[in-house]
Amino acid sequence: MSFGGSGSITNRSTLKPLSVDDLRSPSPQKEYRGFRTSVSNIPQEKKFVPSHLSHFGSSQQRRFAPEVSSPLAEPYESSSSFRLSLSSPPSSKFGGPSFGTPKPFLHTNRLGTGSLIEDAPPTQSIYDFSSSRQINALNVGQSSSPFSPVSEKVYDPSFTMSGAPQDSNTSVIVFGFPPELTNQVIAEFSRFGTIISENSLTASSAGFTPSKGPISGNWLQLTYAEPSSAAKAVLSNGMLINDSFMVGCIYSPAEAKEHVPKTLRNSNKDLEMTDASSSETSMSIPVHADAHFQSQSGLGKKVIVQHKNDIFKSSQKHQPRNWLFHYLFGFGSTEPIDEEEKSKTASDNTSLQTSLFGKIVQVVLHTLFGF
């Protein structure tokens, strides 16, 4: 019992406690160092280099081959990684300070021209061309751009109404609304500016001069304090009021007429505005025809009717017979005849008498002598 106990005690004293390093796997650096030391102990034979490969100098082989003494160098590199390592140092390859920066352009090609150049590794990297291409692309883009930057146009209120004088025209004419909406129209147009006066135009106003008085009709003249307010009011031409009446707005012809040349003022194209009462009076004036007007066809002769009841009667065929008996025998129609009609038919009677006398002579000669 004592031997076993003593033996167990001695075994416990010889065991070592476990550490964190014992649980970790060996690092690749340690394995590579052990592999390098084992490889370096193996004797290597000197290889024979052919004469056609003798132009590869020892300096170039050192340049293209990775450093064996580097602890992070790989024993076997792929073709792609080998090509990238040609133009980039180890510091830039493994995240050094020059990582991501373009490399200088390599102009030298020491391999010369020959049949084996195609099999040789590349001497330039893709990063050697990026900087020059970017610079050339920027230069070409700036020089070959045919368009200049577009300048922003500043809004000029003087070009709002090019056809109207913006410096002096402050009066506008509003039309197209019923008289009961006059106050509402004035309230709507007061939003564009301060209204100095509200005048109504009449047909008797000479030169379109507004006459002060009560507002009547469906149009009026508004005078603003500033020309810009009048321009805004003209731009609102066609505004709807109560969704049923379209109101028009134009510049006042009184002020616009001052800027019109004299040759156009007297023309028939000038704007004229009259009331409905004046148009009705002008339409009611009768047209007087000339009493002595008579066309060759007998149309257009003035006819005077003595009695309104006889206006639809035609007694013209009996008139020559009455005048004939009155002229030959001294009696005829007892109806009163105007002096104007007598003077008119006197000339017709002479021509009728000669024609009738000639017909009687022709009838007598034909009866007596047969011709």
From Swiss-Prot:
It is found in: Nucleus, Nuclear pore complex; Nucleus membrane. GO terms for molecular function: nucleic acid binding; phospholipid binding; structural constituent of nuclear pore. It holds the Pfam family RRM_Nup35. InterPro entries: Nucleotide-bd_a/b_plait_sf (IPR012677), RBD_domain_sf (IPR035979), RRM_NUP35_dom (IPR007846). Glycans are attached at residues 11, 169, 242, 349. Residues 1-72 are annotated as: Disordered. It is a peripheral membrane protein. GO terms for cellular component: nuclear envelope; nuclear membrane; nuclear periphery; nuclear pore; nuclear pore central transport channel; nuclear pore nuclear basket. The modification Phosphoserine is found at residues 88, 92. GO terms for biological process: mRNA transport; NLS-bearing protein import into nucleus; nuclear pore organization; ribosomal subunit export from nucleus. The keyword Transit peptide does not apply. Interacts with kms1 and sad1. This is Nucleoporin nup40.
